[in-house]
Amino acid sequence: NLYQFGKMINHMVGKSPIFSYGDYGCYCGWGGKGTPVDATDRCCFVHDCCYGRANGCDPKLSTYSYNFQNGNIVCGNKYGCLRHICECDRVAAICFGENVNTYDKKFLSSSRCRQTSEQC
């Protein structure tokens, strides 16, 4: 769920998930359209696509099992929708961590996202 995703982001990046990623670029936050503005926004685009492939549960509300081991995020559910959304969140949190050096506050609340959305 979104709370768990936020905990993963905070663990991997050390930033507030709401203030740093809740309204960033074209895809971080609610909705999404246009072309991702940078690598961080691309992480959100891929995450949105991953959520779109979830079948059988609500990615934003369903609670899955995970933990942190040696700095890594480990999903606990072995299969199914809960495993899928945990992996979506895990991969996105890692992606944010890998791209933290290109994160740019100028893309907070971006108004440039008016084009047609990319395909997943």
Swiss-Prot record:
It holds the Pfam family Phospholip_A2_1. Keywords: Blood coagulation cascade inhibiting toxin, Calcium, Cytolysis, Disulfide bond, Hemolysis, Hemostasis impairing toxin, Hydrolase, Metal-binding, Platelet aggregation inhibiting toxin, Secreted, Toxin. CDD domains: PLA2c. One of its GO terms (molecular function) is toxin activity. Ca(2+) binds at residues 27, 29, 31, 48. Negative results: does not show significant fibrinogen-induced platelet aggregation. Basic phospholipase A2 that inhibits ADP-, thrombin- and arachidonic acid-induced platelet aggregation. It also exhibits anticoagulant effects upon human plasma in vitro. It induces a high hemolytic activity reaching its maximum after 24 hours. It induces a marked elevation of plasmatic levels of interleukin-6 and -10, eosinophil peroxidase and complement lytic activities and it also provokes a drastic increase of lymphocytes, monocytes and neutrophils in peripheral blood accompanied by a rapid intense migration of neutrophils to the peritoneal cavity. This is Basic phospholipase A2 Cc2-PLA2. It comes from Cerastes cerastes.
